[in-house]
């Protein structure tokens, strides 16, 4: 029964992969990046810092943190963010306009058809404004709850996939498959801890590292397997190898590409 469940999940991911209409950014080496979201991003020293360190290793140079920003509101949904304020780089102390804006929605936005429609409408407006500001836009597909969260459900990741992929396709933008990477990791190694053990909601350090590796590879189309960054020896070699492997395979399968 467990094997059949795993096969169904893998097949489901394959189906969604074939539905993606955008599989790359025009600019695969952005340095002026804005992340917009909630606590899923800022836990564990913040996802944007981990991605930046991976980019710096890949680029062979430092990324100016003055142009590399994170705007988060605890427990927020897409509609809670003032995109007009954030897109004016001067409001955030940035020196130049952003090249890429990554949008991350709230977990509750997948709860009902009405909420999913509101999410799509809000993203539509935001993406238009991002493009009018000269930047590319991407959606950060969130992960699903796991136990002990009281709302844990196998339907959640299905709704997340559909909402993010449909919305990205309708706006002709990239969707970053973080949620699918979490799912794939749990399928291959059920005992790995990608969520905080006390809530089954927020990412653990391993979860944040996996998410960062997926973002890195989705943006650059380079394999995370080439990255030596291990958060200053805070993450062990075996965990790094596994997380990089999952990120590599997820990104390749999702976009039907070969990472460099």
Q: Locations of the language-model features?
A:
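Short hydrophobic segments within beta-strands
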Residues: 36-37, 140
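Conserved SGNH/GDSL esterase-like catalytic core that processes O-acyl groups on lipids
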Residues: 32-34, 41-120
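Sec-dependent signal peptide recognition
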Residues: 1-8
